[in-house]
């Protein structure tokens, strides 16, 4: 929400949850605490993406659906966002579904569904997921 600070952006969705996460702790884990009083237009695209992820995470969900979370980001920022998602999965125990056209990202998943024309054409379990830091495209 462009007219709210980063902290206010996250606070506004916290009210939708019976058991929200601590906002300051979440801001720290997202690397946004020092930017909490800035407006989204005052930070980078990657930080704006982290804010969007924070709005979803503050509700303490069991499932996070991310549609093209790296689509508009440069390579370095994309990898930072993917590493953040790994951290979210480990720290909060949140299952994450990533929808992407970037096939390289599939290497970090423990399960990959490939779709064609809206139908599942392949369902693969990945026995050895790769860390986001090791991905390259």
What are these regions (language model features)?
Residues 60:
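Conserved catalytic motifs of ABC-family nucleotide-binding domains
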Residues 53:
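Hydrophobic anchor residue at the start of the ABC signature
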Residues 4-11:
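Short coil-to-helix segment of the ABC ATPase nucleotide-binding domain corresponding to the Q-loop/switch region
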Residues 39-49:
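Conserved ABC ATPase signature
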Residues 18-35:
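Conserved ABC ATPase "signature" region
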Residues 64-67:
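Catalytic Walker B motif of ABC-type/P-loop ATPase nucleotide-binding domains
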Residues 75-77:
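Helix N-cap at the start of a conserved alpha-helix in ABC-type nucleotide-binding domains
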């Amino acid at each position: 929400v462009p007219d709210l600070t980063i902290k206010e952006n996250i606070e506004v969705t916290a009210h939708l949850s019976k058991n929200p996460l601590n906002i300051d702790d979440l801001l720290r884990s997202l690397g946004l605490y020092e930017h909490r009083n800035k407006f989204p237009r005052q930070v980078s695209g990657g930080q704006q993406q982290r804010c969007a992820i924070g709005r979803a995470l503050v509700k303490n969900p069991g499932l996070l659906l991310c549609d093209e979370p790296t689509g508009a980001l440069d390579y370095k920022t994309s990898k930072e966002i993917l590493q953040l998602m790994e951290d979210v999965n480990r720290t909060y125990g949140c299952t994450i579904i990533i929808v992407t056209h970037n096939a390289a990202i599939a290497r970090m998943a423990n399960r990959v569904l490939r779709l064609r024309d809206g139908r599942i054409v392949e369902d693969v379990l990945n026995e050895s997921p790769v860390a986001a830091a090791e991905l390259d495209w």
